[in-house]
Amino acid sequence: SLLVTCSRNRLNFPMGTQLISQESISWQKLAPFLDGPIRVRLSPGAKNSIRESNKVLKQILKTKRKVYGVNTGFGKLGNVSISVKDLKQLQLNLVRSHSCGIGKPLDLGVTRLMLVLKLMTYAKGYSGVRPKVAQLLVDMLNHDILPIIPRKGSVGASGDLAPLAHMARGMIGEGDVHFQDRIVPAMIALKESNLNPIVLEAKEGLSLINGTQVSVALGIRSLAEAYILLKTADISGAL
């Protein structure tokens, strides 16, 4: 209806480039991503925190200490050690195996906000991913390259595993994305934007699919629409 589809930008939500730092961002500043692309950039502090967390991960790998999801299997296979030569394949297999969603795609606005929320998580500096993983999220947002993500099938045990796996597929150049008003293979959209897909390294597949970014994006959309309804009710009551 008109009440829930009218532009949230008319509620005086801020526009322009959104800075992603280690600080939290209010839902009012995030809701405009539901309506269309907004440029983003990482703060110097966020970039540094991402670099430092990646250094910690590299040190762990050098010590050969067994760390779950980094150099072990997952779930019941958590005690199984994975050799260094197989770490990349482990992360790739994780993403592919969890890309099992079904049904109609998520709304583009929800997908866009989902990417922003994942970027915000990385900006905190706790994930261990390489800076290029976070930068690809920035570039995909700024080119509005949005992975096609089925809305059903999330496991929910460790967050929104299935939908986030579909997001990760777009980042590795697999699956389809929405780009320039068309649905194309992810590799084509990346190539046309002069971007390269990432090759997942230790822990990166796990860090991409673990999280509640889809649930939070849907929650923000519900909150924004409730705000519109509340303001509309206030106006109607004043007539």
Task: Give the predicted meaning of each segment.
Residues 9-12:
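Intrinsic-disorder-associated, low-complexity terminal segments enriched in Asp/Asn/His/Tyr and depleted
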Residues 15-239:
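Conserved, well-structured ligand/cofactor-binding cores
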